[in-house]
């Protein structure tokens, strides 16, 4: 039977307390052990007195709404994807992390930051998230475009120059750039002066967009060769087609996902998930998902088109630099029976920790 989203939402809102309690017990049983729950066991668990026959009637109503289903004839019930989403939105209580949990995350992640490259910090964070989640922990870092402070072109030979860019936190990037044929030293200076006049407080993508709106001004202020040099400089600094795309993904805990494999079909889904994680477009999509709303985002099964074929859930949160720009994401990928209530605050806190670590002096 097909339902529209609004009709299901209206019907769910009209559920009585008895139906909600039975539904909640079915989902909690699934999240705890992955097993279907039958009417006889449910009748023993409920705080109110209900016969197995009465429980079966309620389960039938819940099944008609699309919230639960029977995996086998005469078996108990499991939540559907719609049911899991309803549970997460309506029943799940996400509390604050305990002081002990926060201290553990600080020790494992921030502690690994002592004189360690960022890759080591990312690895430790993804390992920590994997350890608490029964899933795979992931950390993505994207290219962080610095706010520009100063630029200079230094000729190395007739056809090449060193393009030096200084960011607002005094980070320096040096790139070798091919020079337009016939360009003079004065034209190198002219191009650098133009960039310095227009770049203050902007990132390279900002400057590239601004140049599109300043075509007439550029044409009047710069000759053809200087203009070409400006465009080449921006292109080489911003990485051309890779601008703004993630540069690194760390995933730990693949073995956790193998524990959920129940047969060849599950193994095929897992292969699809691993294949998806290898694709650069997938990393971009994860970052886009993290940016699509405030705080932690939860995607269950086919709600997330990226991992819909593998039937996986994704819990993800962005982290930011000191200018509040999103520069990466942390999260967990795993089976739909993740411990959402525990994982969500941990992903949230880890993202906040990465944000603080990404800021100078913290």
From Swiss-Prot:
Q: Which UniProt keywords apply?
A: Repressor, Stress response, Transcription, Transcription regulation
The similarity comment for this entry is: Belongs to the HrcA family.
Which BP terms does GO give this entry? negative regulation of DNA-templated transcription
Q: Which SUPFAM superfamilies match?
A: GAF domain-like, Winged helix' DNA-binding domain
One short Pfam family name for this protein? HrcA
State a single Gene Ontology molecular function: DNA binding
**Organism classification, top ranks?**
Bacteria, Pseudomonadati, Pseudomonadota, Alphaproteobacteria, Hyphomicrobiales
Any idea what this protein is called? Heat-inducible transcription repressor HrcA
Asked if Transcription regulation is a keyword of the record, the answer is yes
């Amino acid at each position: 039977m097909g339902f529209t989203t609004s009709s299901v939402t209206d019907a769910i809102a009209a559920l009585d307390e008895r139906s909600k309690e039975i539904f909640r017990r079915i989902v909690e049983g699934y999240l705890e052990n992955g097993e279907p729950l039958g009417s006889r066991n449910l009748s023993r668990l409920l705080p109110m007195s209900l016969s197995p026959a009465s429980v079966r009637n309620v389960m039938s109503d819940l099944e008609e709404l699309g919230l639960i289903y029977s995996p086998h004839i005469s078996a108990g019930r499991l939540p559907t994807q719609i049911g899991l989403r309803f549970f997460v939105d309506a029943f799940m209580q996400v509390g604050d992390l305990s002081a002990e949990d926060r201290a553990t995350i600080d020790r494992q992640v921030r502690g690994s930051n002592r004189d360690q490259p960022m890759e080591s910090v990312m690895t430790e964070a993804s390992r920590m998230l994997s350890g608490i989640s029964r899933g795979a922990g992931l950390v993505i870092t994207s290219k962080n475009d610095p706010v520009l402070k100063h630029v200079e072109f230094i000729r190395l030979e007739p056809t090449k120059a060193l393009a030096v860019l200084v960011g607002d936190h005094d980070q320096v990037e040096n790139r070798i750039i091919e020079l337009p044929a016939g360009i003079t030293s004065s034209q190198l200076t002219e191009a650098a002066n133009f960039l310095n006049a227009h770049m203050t407080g902007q990132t390279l993508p900002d400057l590239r967009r601004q140049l599109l709106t300043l075509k007439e001004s550029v044409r009047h202020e710069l000759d053809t060769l200087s203009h070409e040099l400006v465009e080449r400089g921006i292109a080489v600094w911003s990485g051309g087609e890779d601008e703004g795309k993630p540069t690194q993904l760390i995933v730990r805990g693949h073995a956790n996902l193998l524990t959920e494999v129940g047969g060849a079909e599950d193994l095929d889904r897992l292969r699809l998930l691993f294949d998806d994680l290898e694709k650069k477009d997938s990393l971009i999509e994860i970052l886009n998902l993290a940016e699509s709303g405030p705080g932690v985002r939860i995607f269950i099964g086919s709600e997330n088109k990226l991992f819909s074929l593998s039937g996986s859930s994704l819990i993800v949160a962005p982290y930011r630099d000191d200018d509040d720009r999103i520069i990466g994401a942390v999260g967990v990928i795993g089976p739909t029976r993740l411990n959402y209530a525990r994982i969500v605050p941990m992903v949230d806190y880890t993202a906040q920790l990465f944000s603080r670590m990404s800021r100078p002096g913290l």
